[in-house]
Amino acid sequence: AIAGEAAALGVELFVLDDGWFGLRDSDSSGLGDWQVNTDKLPGGLEALVPRINGMGLSFGIWVEPEMVSEDSCLYRSHPDWAFRIPGRLPARGRDQLVLDFSRREVRDSVYGQLKKVISSAPVAYVKWDMNRSLTDVWSAALPAGQQGEVFHRYVLGVYEILERMRQDFPDILIEGCCGGGGRFDGGMLYYTPQIWCSDNTDAMDRLRIQYGTSFCYPTCTMGAHVSAVPNEQNGRITPLAARGIAAMSGAFGYEMDLSRCTPEEKDEIRRQIETYKTHWKLFHQGDYYRLTDPFQDGPFTAWAHVSPDRRKAVVSLVAGPAQTAPPFLALRLKGLDPGLRYRINGASASGGDVLMNAGYPLPEFRGDYQAMQLYLEATE
């Protein structure tokens, strides 16, 4: 039902999240056993993926290869493959331990399982997750005098297995994730050109998160999704328009059960997807301009994506809580050609110099967290 609704609304990729493998019936079991649970998915991916593809959707899958559950076949067979300081109980995070990816035999075992699963069906996307920090970093394969090397060896091991995946599956998009953006860095971006920016999907918090991340990384690398409300992290309720516009400043998607949406919400989602597809080149290849600083607690946050030739732009704005008798507000744009005139949302035209100096007059926002977009195109 979810996939069918997604396809009808214009979604292009359907991702199967945690729980599809081993005896993964809770957070405390199954990690490390990367075989499809055929009780949950009869016929495996070989049966599921063609059905998804038949709806016009590509298929993606979630994995967390660096972790292991103590309640797993892998751990019971090889308890020494997990980081653990001799003579001490290990520190658990999310009821899981960290596999020693500094060891070739560990990487070979895990990757062999993953390769078999991914090869079984036309997988287009892999979300590579990592949901706890490294503790008890002690490798059973190295003497005490070399334990200081383990952190570095571990990272090289992660890179090595990702490189193997890239070589074996060059057409698959790998998205990195680490409890959100905990491992958002240049090294991982080489292997995973898209990284989940944060597990905090609240639209208002994301304005700050994505603003800060943009100082180091292109917006097209930031995984950014619309999620359900009340938001599961903070309980905030924001309009669907605000959530959609906030997510469009990154690698856009939806993290919610679309089959539960109202007809009005589905219409809005369809429009958002059409907008993102129409302006995809601008969002991913245009020049990014920060028009306001969300850390200054102003009345709104705004940004723009401008084409390199400065003839087109998408300006996005999300307002904060509503104000009684608000002052007149104008948004000064950036990146336009001062000598050109721009048609705004297909209607009236204004000069680039006017829009960048006097600004675009904003409407009065009634209600909390209102949002809008301006679509600019040069008239000459």
Question: Language-model features: where?
Answer:
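Catalytic cores of secreted or luminal carbohydrate-active enzymes
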Residues: 241-292
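Aromatic-lined carbohydrate-binding/catalytic grooves of carbohydrate-active enzymes
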Residues: 1-112, 125
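Glycan-recognition surfaces
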Residues: 74-108, 152-259
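Short acidic/histidine-rich active-site segments
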Residues: 124-135, 175-182
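C-terminal beta-strand-rich structural cap/linker in extracellular carbohydrate-active enzymes
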Residues: 352-380
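Conserved, mostly hydrophobic/aromatic
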Residues: 14, 52, 110, 174, ...
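Solvent-exposed beta-hairpin/edge-strand motifs
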Residues: 334-348
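Carbohydrate-binding surface patches
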Residues: 294-337
